Amino acid sequence: MSLTGYFAAPLCSIFLFILAHADAGQQEDSLYMWIDAHQARVLIGFEEDILIVAEGKMAPFTHDFRKAQQRMPAIPVNIHAMNFTWQATGQAEYFYEFLSLRSLDKGIMADPTVNMPLLGTVPHKATVIQVGFPCLGNQDGVAAFEVNVIVMNSEGNVILQTPQNAIFFKTCQQAKCTGGCRNGGFCNDRHVCECPDGFYGPHCEKALCMPRCMNGGLCVTPGLCICPPGYYGINCDKVNCTTHCLNGGTCFYPGKCICPSGYEGEQCETSKCQQPCRNGGKCSGKNKCKCSKGYQGDLCSKPVCEPSCGAHGTCIEPNKCQCKEGWNGRYCNKKYGSNLMNALRPTGSRNRQHTPSPKRTEDRQALPESNYIW
């Protein structure tokens, strides 16, 4: 027998006791559990199926658990998990529940693990159950642990269960990971660093930031980015410009501005219009102005009057006309004095021909000449 087989052979006795009789009179005949030949080779050095439960009954073995437990060795360092195979044949339904998977020495080994739900139905297809013994690798030592599981039939009767107060043992040793484990990671017994949440890498040296660090930022701890010069923000997504962007420009890179239409230059300080836009207008393209309300023209130099001042006036400000001589009104559409003469003329003579006297003509010509602005 190999050296591994010499130390591993008694291990079968440990797991032959994981399930013991709960009801000696039970005659269920379609539940099976065994250790397959491949796993047996690892344990005892030769390939042979090891039957644990057959036809709902335990394989012939001692039932004096206390005496047997005294002879149980600790699981060796080189065995990290054990595989069992089970199957429910026929039409019968069986249910299982892991009541406890607990390490009693958590500084040496974490809680045992299984590769299946803790509560479920025994499958009708041969299925492997793997029980793992996760040594932490922090120190040399032997960890005590318990595995408590029951199997019930469809009527809810417990037919198999772990003996009460069953304690098992696993030998662990301090692991060595070349380069060490950082950021709270620990070296397991497979000499691999196991990293805490938020870190990854062979030595747990890399932090995980979500969202990721942008613009060359470095994630130094979960959720914290160190930003390169010129950037800031939770994930370095914001730009810190040393120079201010003018005329509505936007900084997108340290010292670089995205200029709005009509401006150029490092700080968007230069207008693309050769002559500046007037009256509040903005340069919107090469030599093209976008005028503010009330103005028009290439340079926004022409005021707008609505409606227009007509043929007898000039628009000098938005909606403000300057009338020619002899014209008045807001839009210069009224001739000066016409309303006054009609008002003074007698009613009966408005339709008669009338020749003004020389004196009235002189008085009329004596009216002051003025350029009205309305």
UniProtKB/Swiss-Prot annotation:
Organism domain of life: Eukaryota
Family matches, as Gene3D superfamilies: Laminin, Wnt, WIF domain
Name used for this protein in its record: Wnt inhibitory factor 1
Residues in the signal sequence: 1-28
Taxonomic source organism: Xenopus laevis
GO MF term set: signaling receptor binding
Expression tissues: During somatogenesis, expressed predominantly in unsegmented paraxial presomitic mesoderm and, to a much lesser extent, in newly segmented somites.
CDD domains in alphabetical order: EGF_CA
Disulfide bond residue pairs: 135-172, 177-187, 181-193, 195-204, 209-219, 213-225, 227-236, 241-251, 245-257, 259-268, 273-283, 277-289, 291-300, 305-315, 309-321, 323-332
GO biological process: Wnt signaling pathway
Keywords of the record: Developmental protein, Disulfide bond, EGF-like domain, Glycoprotein, Repeat, Secreted, Signal, Wnt signaling pathway
Glycosylation-annotated residues: 83, 240
Residues covered by region (Disordered): 343-374
Protein's job: Binds to WNT proteins and inhibits their activities. May be involved in mesoderm segmentation.
CC annotations in GO: cell surface; extracellular region
Alphabetized Pfam families for the sequence: hEGF, JAG1-like_EGF2, WIF
Annotated EGF-like domain residues: 173-205, 208-237, 237-269, 270-301, 302-333
Compositionally biased intervals (Polar residues): 348-358
Compartments it resides in: Secreted
Residue stretches making up the WIF domain: 33-172
